UniProtKB/Swiss-Prot annotation:
Protein name: Short chain dehydrogenase gsfE
InterPro entries found in the cross-reference section: NAD(P)-bd_dom_sf, PRISE-like_Rossmann-fold
Protein's UniProt keywords contain Cytoplasm: no
Uppermost EC category: oxidoreductase
Catalyzed chemical reaction(s): dehydrogriseofulvin + NADPH + H(+) = griseofulvin + NADP(+)
MF GO annotations: nucleotide binding; oxidoreductase activity
Organism: Penicillium aethiopicum
Keywords, in A-Z order: NADP, Nucleotide-binding, Oxidoreductase
GO biological-process terms attached to the record: griseofulvin biosynthetic process; terpenoid biosynthetic process
Lineage, highest ranks first: Eukaryota, Fungi, Dikarya, Ascomycota, Pezizomycotina
Disruption phenotype: Impairs the production of griseofulvin, but accumulates the intermediates dehydrogriseofulvin and dechloro-dehydrogriseofulvi.
Domain of life (superkingdom): Eukaryota
Recorded family membership: Belongs to the short-chain dehydrogenases/reductases (SDR) family. Highly divergent.
C-alpha cells in the first residue's frame, strides 16, 4: 500500500525540503498522498497532484486540532514535525515550542489510526552548542548538558518517546546543524540568504566583505546541513524498521574553516574577501562571546543600496527580501568563540550514505534564491 505523509511547517526550510524530496524522487505507488500543513497559505516550488494542503496552527487546543485533522489523516502513515516558533527570549521560546509539539503529537496520535512513524526535527541546539563549548563533534548518545536556559528540544524528544510507549508506531529524531537551503517563504533564520545579501550589497558598494565574527571562530572548525540532505535522511530512517526509535545527527558530512570558506562564497557572488582578514579586537578566550563588528548595525543604512540594486536589475519584487534577512541572527551565530560540529557516524552505521560538499550547498542555494526571485544576479 502507498504511504501517506503528513508534514508540518511545510513553508519552512526543512518542511518544504521534505515536500520537494517526496515529489521529486518518489511515485504515487510509493507515496500516494502528501498532506502539508502550515499556519499561513502553502507556497511550494513544486507542483504535484499528491499534495493536499490543510491550514493548521498547533498553538490551538488538541480537541479542535483532532476535529480538523481526522478528516484528512485517516490514511496518514508517516508524520514529520518541522514546526518552530522563533522567540528572542529563551524562556518564551521554551514555552511556546514545548506546547506546539505536545499539541501536535497528541492530535496526530488520535487522528491517524494507520500511523507507522513520527519523526521530529530538533537540531544541534540539543547539545547546547549555542550556549557554551561542548565536546565536538557531538554524538547522539552524549550526556545532556543543562545550561542556564531550559532546552525545549529535551522536552520535545522526551514527550515523543513517552507518547510512543505501547503504541504500534515508531519514532525518529533528526538533529541538523545550521540549515542551508531556499524556500518560497524565507524568514529571518535563513543563514544563506543573509550571507548572499551581505555579499551582494558589498559588491554594489565596491567594498570588501569581511566576516562579522572573531578571530577564534574564523579559524575554528564548523559544519552545516543542506536542507535537501536533511530530507533525504529523514525519509531514509523513517521508512526503515532497522532505524526505528533512534535519533540521528545530519550534516553535509564535511568540515570547514570560515577563514577559507568565506572568501570562496564571496567570490561566487562577485564580492571580495580575504583569508588573511585582520581583526581589530584581540583573540578572545574560548567560551567568550565576541564580534569584531555587528552585522545588525552594519545593515541599518543599506536598504537603499539593496533597493537600487534590485531596480537596476529589473527585480523590484526582491526589495522585500531585505526585511527577510537575519542580520541579528548572523551576529548570534558568529559571536561564538568555539567550534561546534556534529558526528554523522551513527547514520553511516545504519546505512545512510548521503553527502554534500558544503561550498556547493551554499552555491546551489544562492542559485535557487535567484530562481525564486529573492535576490538579483
Amino acid at each position: 500500500m502507498p504511504k501517506t505523509a503528513f508534514i508540518t511547517g511545510a513553508n519552512g526550510l526543512s518542511g518544504s525540503a521534505i515536500v520537494e524530496y517526496l515529489c521529486n524522487t518518489t511515485t504515487s505507488d510509493d507515496w500516494g498522498s502528501i498532506i502539508v500543513t502550515s499556519r499561513s497559505p502553502f507556497k511550494s516550488t513544486v507542483m504535484d497532484p499528491r499534495i493536499k494542503f490543510i491550514a493548521l496552527d498547533f498553538v490551538n487546543d488538541v480537541s479542535s486540532l483532532v476535529e480538523t485533522m481526522k478528516e484528512v489523516c485517516g490514511a496518514v502513515t508517516h508524520a514529520y514535525f518541522c514546526s518552530y516558533l522563533h522567540k528572542d527570549d529563551f524562556a518564551e521560546s521554551y514555552t511556546v515550542n514545548k506546547a506546539l509539539f505536545e499539541n501536535f503529537i497528541a492530535a496526530i496520535d488520535k487522528a491517524a489510526p494507520k500511523l507507522e512513524n513520527v519523526t521530529l526535527q530538533t537540531g544541534g541546539k540539543y547539545y547546547n552548542l549555542h550556549v557554551e563549548p561542548v565536546p565536538s563533534p557531538a554524538r547522539e548518545n552524549d550526556p545532556r548538558r543543562y545550561g542556564p536556559f531550559e532546552n525545549f528540544y529535551f522536552t520535545q524528544e522526551d514527550t515523543l518517546a513517552e507518547m510512543q510507549r505501547g503504541k504500534t508506531w515508531s519514532w525518529n529524531v533528526i538533529r541538523p546543524e545550521a540549515i542551508i537551503g531556499a524556500n518560497s517563504q524565507p524568514y529571518g533564520l535563513n543563514v544563506a540568504l543573509t550571507i548572499a545579501m551581505y555579499f551582494l550589497i558589498c559588491r554594489e558598494l565596491g567594498s570588501a566583505s569581511p566576516m562579522p565574527t572573531n578571530q577564534r571562530y574564523w579559524e575554528g572548525t564548523d559544519d552545516v546541513s543542506y536542507a535537501p540532505l536533511i530530507a533525504d535522511l529523514t525519509i531514509f530512517v523513517s521508512t526503515r524498521k532497522s532505524c526505528a526509535n533512534e535519533a540521528f545527527n545530519v550534516t553535509n558530512g564535511d568540515y570547514f574553516t570560515w577563514r577559507y570558506m568565506w572568501p570562496r562564497l564571496a567570490a561566487s557572488l562577485g564580492a571580495k574577501a580575504d583569508s588573511q582578514q585582520c581583526f581589530e579586537k584581540p583573540m578572545p578566550g574560548e567560551g567568550e562571546l565576541q564580534l569584531d563588528w555587528s552585522l545588525a548595525e552594519w545593515c541599518k543604512d543599506k536598504r537603499k543600496v539593496w533597493e537600487d540594486l534590485c531596480d537596476r536589475q529589473g527585480l523590484p519584487g526582491a526589495k522585500a527580501t531585505f526585511d527577510l534577512a537575519g542580520w541579528a541572527v548572523g551576529d548570534f551565530l558568529y559571536q561564538r568563540t568555539w567550534s561546534a560540529t556534529l558526528s554523522v557516524n551513527k547514520a553511516r552505521r545504519f546505512g545512510w550514505t548521503g553527502h554534500m560538499d558544503s561550498y556547493q550547498s551554499f552555491v546551489d542555494t544562492f542559485d535557487k534564491f535567484r530562481q525564486l526571485g529573492l535576490i538579483p544576479k
